[in-house]
Curated annotation (Swiss-Prot):
Species the sequence originates in: Saccharomyces cerevisiae (strain ATCC 204508 / S288c)
Record's protein name: Homothallic switching endonuclease
Spans traversing the lipid bilayer: none
GO cellular component, one term: nucleus
Molecular function GO labels: DNA binding; endonuclease activity; zinc ion binding
Keywords for the protein's UniProt record, in alphabetical order: DNA-binding, Endonuclease, Hydrolase, Metal-binding, Nuclease, Nucleus, Zinc, Zinc-finger
Post-translational modification: Rapidly degraded via the ubiquitin-26S proteasome system through two ubiquitin-conjugating enzymes UBC2/RAD6 and UBC3/CDC34.
GO biological process annotation, one example: gene conversion at mating-type locus
Subcellular location: Nucleus
The gene coding this protein: HO
Cysteines paired by S-S bonds: none
Keyword Disulfide bond tagged: no
Key word Nucleus present: yes
Length: 586
């Protein structure tokens, strides 16, 4: 069962709160079909937060302390469900060859297999388990080990896909738990709202409809909200010509305006009707303009304050319309970087100052089967073309998705952003690793779907239909939590730990790198500061504090807890644990 804060993607593309979903309504399934809701149940149970693991760290360090808005990880995938709710989990099956023994005297092959396991309350569940097999360290032994690996790869496949209840996740060992992933899926069907508005038919996706979607994306990226005016890079003639051609389809012609001081960005107005034969003062700019009607009537411009936004119906539009719309945003405000070879190497970044546009970019990207993350930058002063510019708080939307991203770029018209259409488009679910944490008690709802199909949440996460295991409170009984924690930061679930100041493997890779570079750590909260944070603490001067043993100590102040930073002049295997250089015992 799912928390009352959960949103559901309905069959018509609408995103609805689960509390408002009724029996006999239709939801969007993972395979693109619509399925009827047979029954809706309600209860009050303990819930767990299933949350995407990310590399966002701004909320942990100095950026989050200086700017409260950067403490939020925007558009992080998550769902709240009960302990008895089943998750569709995937783990890799790739066997590994490594050396074993005190002096590496044997070859060891580590592999995984699905097998039965009995829980502490007597249930039988099927989960993957780690196994290993040893071979002598000889030429024959190495050959036999490689043959065994090939046999395992043929018989096991690339991944194990299995269903597991949330309360049983602790029965996976640490390595399996870290590599476990759930998925979100693309939206394969379209609601056709834009097509219906432009052509009168929701199933009609013509080149004219796609050209309008592209112009709407271009307008949302860089334009004024007062009139149909778009800023275009004057050094990109292909973009200007493409805008002229797409506008002509809708009976629009362009006029280029310039500032008092000529700039690289030119203001292009979209007038309706034939171009004037002579210079006249009155032109159809907003009156009868089909582009401006789409902007205002379909709510791309908010009514109350006139701010730009991406309306929710665009999240579930036809795939071609979504791709053309996103391409317009990329042409206007996006960057395309190619790293390595192959279609998977394209990385797309779109910057915006509007939170509603950021939400729309992420939703549309995920609905096309692409991964999307958001980083932030605080308000700042920058110098652009020799001028000081006050930049607002910015959202950086980063998108990647293999052939799906390349197909989006094929709709772009900017000369250096457009790419060829890929020969094959693989629109598949995207997997992500996750953590699970207890949240408390809440009102929960369970949806029973016809055919027990998997359906999509509002954030595109694929979930299973509720069955008998969801009814009633399910006890979570397990021996221990297998995920490890870094002692210096909140990070958990990481594979490898490194030696800290005590000589034990207790810190993650980032904190280990900081400690190795700066040599400082807090004696109270064990936080490892960055070099710039150490410099600021030293500039403030030393302060008097108390060690955990109750002794007075003097040193730089920890900016996180107000404790004392200790400096270890010698780090590594030759460090003496009793060395307190930099934090003087008084």
């Amino acid at each position: 069962m799912l928390s009352e804060n959960t949103t559901i993607l309905m069959a018509n593309g609408e995103i609805k709160d689960i509390a408002n979903v009724t029996a006999n309504s239709y939801v969007m399934c993972a395979d693109g079909s619509a399925a009827r809701v047979i029954n809706v149940t309600q209860g009050y149970q303990k819930i767990y937060n299933i949350q995407q693991k990310t590399k966002h760290r701004a909320f942990e360090g100095e950026p989050g302390r200086l700017d409260p808005r950067r403490r939020t990880v925007y558009q992080r995938l998550a769902l709240q469900c009960t302990a008895g709710h089943k998750l569709s989990v995937r783990v890799p099956t790739k066997p590994l060859l490594e050396k074993s023994g005190r002096n590496a005297t044997k070859y060891k092959v580590r592999w995984r297999n699905l097998q039965q396991c009995q829980t502490l309350d007597g249930r039988i569940i099927i989960i993957p388990k780690n196994h290993h097999k040893t071979f002598p360290m000889t030429v024959e032994g190495e050959f036999a080990a490689k043959r065994f690996i090939e046999e395992m790869e043929r018989s096991k496949g690339e991944y194990f896909n299995f269903d597991i209840e949330v309360r049983d996740l602790d029965y996976l060992d640490a390595q399996l738990r870290i590599s476990s992933c759930i998925r979100f899926g693309p939206v394969l069907a379209g609601n056709g709202v834009l097509s219906k508005f432009l052509t009168g038919r929701s199933d009609l996706v013509t080149p004219a409809v796609k050209s309008m979607a592209w112009m709407l994306g271009l307008w949302l990226g860089d334009s004024t909200t007062k009139e149909p005016e778009i800023s275009v890079d004057s050094l990109d003639p292909k973009l200007m010509e493409s805008l002229r051609e797409n506008a002509k389809i809708w009976g629009l012609y362009l006029t280029v305006c310039d500032d008092h001081v000529p700039l690289r960005a030119k203001h292009v107005r979209l007038h309706y009707g034939d171009g004037p034969d002579e210079n006249r003062k009155t032109r159809n700019l907003r009156k009868n303009n089909p582009f401006w009607k789409a902007v205002t009537i379909l709510k791309f411009k908010r009514d109350l304050d006139g701010e730009k936004q991406i309306p929710e119906f665009m999240y579930g539009e036809h795939i071609e319309v979504r791709e053309a719309f996103l391409a317009g945003l990329i042409d206007s405000d996006g960057y395309v970087v190619k790293k390595g070879e192959g279609p998977e190497s394209y990385k797309i970044a779109i910057q915006t100052v509007y939170s509603s546009i950021m939400d729309g970019i992420v939703h549309i990207s995920r609905s096309l089967g692409m991964s999307a993350t958001v980083t932030t930058r605080s308000a700042r002063e920058e110098i652009i073309e020799g001028r000081k510019v006050q930049c607002q708080f910015t959202y950086d939307c980063n998108v990647a998705g293999g052939t799906t991203s390349q197909n989006v770029l094929s709709y772009c018209r900017s000369g250096h952003k457009t790419r060829e259409v890929p020969p094959i488009i693989k629109r598949e679910p995207v997997y992500f690793s996750f953590t699970d944490d207890f949240q408390g008690e809440s009102t929960v709802y369970g949806l029973t779907i016809e055919g027990h199909k998997n359906f999509l949440l509002g954030n595109k996460i694929e979930v299973k239909s509720c069955r008998g295991c969801c009814v009633g409170e399910q006890l979570k009984i397990s021996q221990k939590k297998n995920l490890k924690h870094c002692v210096a930061c909140p990070r958990k679930g990481i594979k490898y730990f490194y030696k800290d100041w005590s000589g034990k493997n207790r810190v993650c890779a980032r904190c280990y790198g900081r400690y190795k570079f700066s040599g400082h750590h807090c004696i109270n909260c064990k936080y490892v500061p960055e070099a710039r944070e150490v410099k600021k603490a030293k500039d403030k001067g030393e302060k008097l504090g108390i060690t955990p043993e109750g002794l007075p100590v003097k040193g730089p102040e920890c900016i996180k807890c107000g404790g004392i930073l200790q400096f270890d002049a010698v780090r590594g295997p030759h460090k003496s644990c009793g060395n307190n250089a930099g934090a003087r015992i008084c």
